[in-house]
Amino acid sequence: MGRVSSIISFSLTLLILFNGYTAQQWPNECQLDQLNALEPSQIIKSEGGRIEVWDHHAPQLRCSGFAFERFVIEPQGLFLPTFLNAGKLTFVVHGRGLMGRVIPGCAETFMESPVFGEGQGQGQSQGFRDMHQKVEHLRCGDTIATPSGVAQWFYNNGNEPLILVAAADLASNQNQLDRNLRPFLIAGNNPQGQEWLQGRKQQKQNNIFNGFAPEILAQAFKINVETAQQLQNQQDNRGNIVKVNGPFGVIRPPLRRGEGGQQPHEIANGLEETLCTMRCTENLDDPSDADVYKPSLGYISTLNSYNLPILRLLRLSALRGSIRKNAMVLPQWNVNANAALYVTNGKAHIQMVNDNGERVFDQEISSGQLLVVPQGFSVMKHAIGEQFEWIEFKTNENAQVNTLAGRTSVMRGLPLEVITNGYQISPEEAKRVKFSTIETTLTHSSPMSYGRPRA
C-alpha cells in the first residue's frame, strides 16, 4: 500500500511540475502583439531550380503551426520524389507542368497503350510497357492536396519557370513528430542541409537510400551492388531539382481544349471515384466558379472538404482572392482556423487587430510576401495597385469567416438597442452603422468621402 501511495505521489508531483512548466511556456507561445510580412530565410539551390524556405520557428508561424516553402522549377527541371511528415496544400503561382504522386498501397493505374502512349521513353526494350501511378497536368491556379507520407514529384514541361508555394500543417495529427518540417528524399540530395532544424548540426542531407548498406538494397531490389550505389546519389551534387536532358516520357492523359475558351483540362481515366485515384487538385483561378464575384471589384473562391473531399483527411482548406484597385475586403475574422496569406501579385494595404483591440499589422504587403492571420484576429484588405491577388491556406477543412460590416455581418445581426447603448450613438447613427453597407464581402473603398476621425 505504501508503495502504491509513493507511486501516486510521485506521479502527481510530475504532473504538477509539467503543468507548471507548460504554464510558463504557453503564455509566450502565441504573444502576437506585432506581426510582420515574412520573407524566405533560406534558399536551397539545385541544378534545375531552387527551394525557398520560411523560418517556421518565427513566432507567428510557430503559433499557427504552418511551415511554408516556395519552389522555382526551371524549364525541363524535375523536382525529385519527396514526402513530408505533415499534410500540405500546394498552389501553382506561375507556369505549367506535370505532377505525380505515389499513394502507399495503391497499384499503377497509368499504363502504356495505343491510347496513352505519347512520349514513350527512348531505348526501352521491345515489348516492354511502363506503368505507374497517376500523373496530372498543372496550370496556374491549381491547388493540390497532399497527405503526409505521400511521395510527390513535379516536372516543368513549359517554357517559363514553374513557381509553386506550399503550406504544411505541422500542428495537425498527420504529423507524429516534432514541429519541424522534415522532407524525406526518395532521390537526389540537399548539399546545403536543413538549416531550419534547430539543434541539428548543419550537414548535407542525403536521400533515404543512402542510409542502407548497398548489399541490402541490392537484395531488396534484386539488382547488382553498383546499381544500388547509384540509388544512393552519393556522388551526385545536382540537388533536389535536376535538369532533364532530352524528352521526358511519362504516361499521362492528353489535354483537350475546354469549352467556351476555357483552360485546357485532362480527359478523365474513369477511375477518379476510387480511393487510390481520389481527386487531389482543384483550380481556383476561374472567376466563373467563384463564390463571390463582382466585375468591378474582383472575386473570391474557396476550397474546402465539400468540393475537394481529400481535405477532410488533411484538415486544411484554401481561399483565392483577386481584387481590383480601390476594392476592399470588408473587415472579417477566421472563426475556426489560422491562416497563412501569400501574395501572388500586386500590392495591398492590410490592417489587423488582435483580441486586445490593438492594431498588430498596418502595412503594405506585396508579391512574394507571407502574412499569418491568427484565429479571431480581424483583418481588412485594401488593394492599392491595379490588382491584388493572394492565396490563403487555413488550418480547418471547412474554415469559416465572420464579417464586422455588411449584409451578413455580426453588426447586422445585433438589435439596434444593443448598438445604440453599446457605442453611445443615436438610433439614426445606429441604423446607418447596421444597414449602410449592403455588400457581403467586397466593396469600393474611397475613404476621403467619409471624412476624417475626430482628434
Curated annotation (Swiss-Prot):
Main location: other
GO BP annotations, alphabetical order: cellular response to abscisic acid stimulus; response to abscisic acid; seed maturation
Post-translational modification: Ubiquitinated.
Sites bearing Phosphothreonine, chain numbering: T109, T395, T420
Secretion signal, residue range per the UniProt entry: 1-24
Coiled-coil parts of chain: none
Annotated positions of the Phosphoserine modification: S301, S367, S436
Tissue: Accumulates in seeds 8 days after anthesis.
Keyword Cell wall biogenesis/degradation attached: no
Location in the cell: Protein storage vacuole
Cited InterPro entries: 11S_seedstore_CS, 11S_seedstore_pln, Cupin_1, RmlC-like_jellyroll, RmlC_Cupin_sf, Seed_Storage-Functional
Protein family according to the UniProt entry: Belongs to the 11S seed storage protein (globulins) family.
Description of how the protein assembles with itself and partners: Hexamer; each subunit is composed of an acidic and a basic chain derived from a single precursor and linked by a disulfide bond.
Functional summary from the UniProt entry: Seed storage protein.
Entry protein name: 12S seed storage protein CRB
